[in-house]
Amino acid sequence: MKKPLMKSLLVAFSALLATSVVPLSSAQANDTLGQKVQYDTKAPVNDGKDISIQYWTWNDGDPAIKLAESYQKLHPNVKIEVVNHPWDDYWTKLPLALQGSDGPAIFNIHNSQDKLLSSYLEAYDIPTEDLKADFTGVEPHVVDGKVNYIDIVMNTGNIYYNKKMWQAAGLTDKDIPKTWDEFRQVAKKLTIKEGDNLVQAGFNWNGSYAGLYQGLNYQKGTLLFQEDGTTPNYNNETTKENLKFLVDLYEVDGVGSKDFGTDDTQSFGNQQSAMVYKWGWFANELKTKYPDVEYGVFATPTFSKDQPFAYDRYNGESTPGINKNQSEEQRKVAQDFLKYLLANDQYSLEAAKAYASYPTKNSVQEDKSLKSDPVLSVIAPRIKKLIWPGPFPATMETSAKKAAEEVLYNGVDLDSALENAQRQMERDMRNESFKSLESAYQ
């Protein structure tokens, strides 16, 4: 990311927390939504003839689902069938479906799967300059003057904690840890055992290492990629130190366990774990699947009280993709629905709330409904010290995850696990065109 973009993010984010609602434009008060990207709500779709398209996603809280309902009310002749696949199944089923002519006309995208999907994507039928005028951060997604998707929000990792468990342990807001050493002590207080059996984990990172290691490495000034910007930088002393730190939380401090389930998301939702590291999407996960959990959020600790090299990575949640292999009739409807999403401020607001993330649409960055969001208020002070490495290939996370599992479950030593993961990452990226954007961070 270029420095001017980061400055614009900081200014806009500060405004988000300090100002009130932006009034609707005169166009929005009539039949047209949007600023530069506009949508005519009265224009017929598919010449008014009945048509059905599919929208695929992996997320029950996907904001496009809610907007699909309002779109269908505007256009009763259009039916949008939402198909929800679990995350792990999604990336197997979607590419197979897109190869033929019967795949979904429009679908949810995660930028870590850019290479997997790029050959199936139809460029947006919206002028790129209009997108740039309405949204922050479009430029990194421009290819040959067009975009296949952009970021609707940007987010990063935080620590979520169970408020009831926190209170039961005698902790208050004054005990929010700033450093990892303080965090270890808090985690111990939150841990409950019956004999040798772990009943309540003080901190559970089972399933979250792939994202957690990146922020820990950044805090110590170690980038994810080597100086050439293309070679993974996983097998190093920083990664080793940080993985040992996480393992020691379990094996030395006893605040969690590799055997305490494989999914920290579910464990926190079932109120078996007191703290987890999660990104903005987790707020909506709790709202939709675990509404009884009373939770709080605080910034991920650092290794000292001094400002680190960076606090963490940040990433964007992507706008939907259009299937270029679908029929022209279906693609036109999909493009129309997409324009409805991007012109409609409500889509950005729903995304910001669903993912607890910073909205990229300029017209909603000052909306007062976002000011009280607990996650946004925690992200705000750190926004200038977050790194965007670009949409790196999935192996940077999948291979790292395997390394941690090898250490935890198979007794593989740290050096061997890191060497194996590094080798796998390099093998997977041998023919990649990816170039890290970390060098632009200042």
Predicted regions: what is each one?
Residues 39, 45-47, 142, 298, ...:
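Long, aromatic- and glycine/proline-rich binding clefts that accommodate carbohydrate-like moieties
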Residues 105, 128-166, 201, 307-312, ...:
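A structural signal for short loop-to-beta-strand junctions that line the ligand-binding cleft
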Residues 73-74, 79-81, 169, 252, ...:
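Extracytoplasmic/periplasmic substrate-recognition and gating elements
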Residues 148-152, 157, 181-231, 238, ...:
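Extracytoplasmic/periplasmic solute-binding protein
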Residues 186-189, 228-258:
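Glycine-centered hinge/linker elements that transmit conformational signals in sensory
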Residues 48-59, 78-83, 106, 148:
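Short, well-ordered beta-strand elements
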Residues 30-44, 109-158, 184, 214, ...:
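Hinge/lid segment of periplasmic solute-binding proteins
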Residues 70-136, 168-170, 175-178, 274-275, ...:
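Extracytoplasmic "Venus flytrap"/periplasmic binding protein-like
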